Amino acid sequence: EGVLYVLPFRTQFSVRNSHKVYLKRMLLSEDDCNLLPSWAFFIRCLVNADGLLSTASRESLVSNDLLKDARKEIGMAIKDYLRGLVQNNRAMFNKILDVHHFHIKAIASEDNELLRLFMDYLPFETNKGVRSFGSIRSADNVICYTRNLEDFRQVRRIAGAQGWLVVNAAYTFDETLLKKYARLNPELTLDEISPSRLLEQFGEVEAKKEFR
C-alpha cells in the first residue's frame, strides 16, 4: 500500500529521486528499492511493503519474484492513471505531458495499447516547429522524417521551400515510436529523408523545368 506522486518538475533518467519505502511500517530506505519501473523517473513513491523481504543489511528489498510482481503492479497503476486522464481529464494529462513528455514517450514505446492512446498527443520537432503527432498525421498519410540531427538541419529549409513537413526523429524514442505506430497503422507510410535524396529530387525538378 502507498501513494505515488507525479513530480511537478522535469526530471532526467540519470537523476534518482528521493522516496520513502517502509517494510512492515518501519523505514527501510529513501531509495525506491527497485519498486518503480525503469521509466518511472517522474514518479515519487511513499510505500509500505508488508509482503516483501529485506536484504540482510536491511538497506533494500530482496530482488525476487515478489519484488518483480510488485514492480509490475506499480507500473500498471501508473499506466492506468495516465489512461484515465486521457479519457476523463485531458487538461490534467496535458499539464503532465508538458513537463514529462519524454517519460510518457518511454512508456508508449514499450506498451502498444498506450502507444495507440497517447501517440496523437505526443510532441515532435518538425521543420515547421513542434507539433503533436495528431497534427502531423492529419496533414498527410506519408510521414517524412530524418534519423539524425545533422540531416534534419540540412533538409529543413529545402523541405520547407518544397512545402514538405519533416519530423526530426533524432531524439530518444522518437524513431521507435514512429516505426511502431506505423506497424500498428498500415494506412500510414514512413519516408526517411536524407539531404542527398532531397537534392536529387530537387535536381530532377530543375532539369524538367529546363527541358520544357
Question: What is the role of each PLM region?
Answer:
Residues E1-R212:
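Conserved GHKL (Bergerat-fold) ATPase module
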